[in-house]
Amino acid sequence: MDLSAEFKRWKAQCLSKADLSRKGSVDEDVLEIVQLLNGQEQFFTTSSCAGRIILLDRSVNGSEVQKQNCCWLLVTHKACVKDDVIVALQKAKGDAILKFEPLVLHVQCRQLQDAQILHSVAIDSGFRNSGITVGKRGKTMLAVRSTHGLEVPLSHQGKLMVTEEYINFLLKIANQKMEENKKRIERFYHCLQHALEKETVSTTSQPKEKVNTSYIRKKKRNPGKARGKRVNEEHDKELENNDHDDPGISDTIFPEDY
């Protein structure tokens, strides 16, 4: 079957499905990106989370929402305050863990070249742990993600193991990471707009073969460098200060059965 026609069928099926996420809708901070991608014929999003602060209890008892053998005691996509965490901790019966999870966005792409363009946008926006996978059925997926996270245990078997002062300290860090995550999302949106405009101009002004060759040659430049080196100079120092432990990402593409 023609891969282009198959991609259109996949996209129509995915976008027609009901949102089965816990929230039931796309997070506000990532909505513009999702709408922009789904409005392009070469992309569609399969899942997304704008970033969140969560408090989990590794106990399957209780009335709280359960996921992967955990109870969600607290979930917020905004800055979190100490009092909310203290109240939520009173429900913990197992090992309570405070986490900050940055943006995660999964995008199916029509072809590898489209995924490469989106991958460059992600890396240049600070999401240095992004990667491409190609499935056995020809599905090309891009995952936008970073290591700009946080995970700290607070209680064990229902007993609080840290002070309220330390919880307040952790929340300051988590809230700072949330703010940085939002800046990267905004940067991603603007970089995506620019990349799509540039690709449209290139496609209309040059034969398609030349556009493909030019882009691939650009991607192969300095293959030994870590992807972190490709962040724009104007915000490279900022990213290094905020996310200095991010690993470099190679161009390795590995098969995955989607």
Curated annotation (Swiss-Prot):
Pfam families of this UniProt entry?
Answer: TYW3
Q: Which GO terms describe its cellular component?
A: cytoplasm
Q: Give the keywords, sorted.
A: Methyltransferase, Phosphoprotein, S-adenosyl-L-methionine, Transferase, tRNA processing
User: What's a GO biological-process term for it?
Assistant: wybutosine biosynthetic process
Its recorded reaction(s) are: 4-demethyl-7-[(3S)-3-amino-3-carboxypropyl]wyosine(37) in tRNA(Phe) + S-adenosyl-L-methionine = 7-[(3S)-3-amino-3-carboxypropyl]wyosine(37) in tRNA(Phe) + S-adenosyl-L-homocysteine + H(+)
E.C. code: 2.1.1.282
List every position bearing Phosphoserine.
S25
Provide any one GO MF term from the record: tRNA methyltransferase activity
Specify the superkingdom: Eukaryota
Q: Where is the composition biased (Basic residues)?
A: 216-229
Start and end residues of each stretch annotated as Disordered: 199-258
Which residue windows does the record flag with biased composition (Basic and acidic residues)?
Answer: 230-247
SUPFAM superfamilies in UniProt: SSo0622-like
**What pathway, per the record?**
tRNA modification; wybutosine-tRNA(Phe) biosynthesis
Recorded hits in InterPro entries, A to Z, give: tRNA_yW-synthesising, tRNA_yW-synthesising-like_sf
List the PANTHER family.
TRNA WYBUTOSINE-SYNTHESIZING PROTEIN 3
> Its family?
Belongs to the TYW3 family.
Briefly, what is this protein's role?
Probable S-adenosyl-L-methionine-dependent methyltransferase that acts as a component of the wybutosine biosynthesis pathway. Wybutosine is a hyper modified guanosine with a tricyclic base found at the 3'-position adjacent to the anticodon of eukaryotic phenylalanine tRNA.
The protein's name is: tRNA wybutosine-synthesizing protein 3 homolog
Per the UniProt record, the source organism is Bos taurus (Bovine)
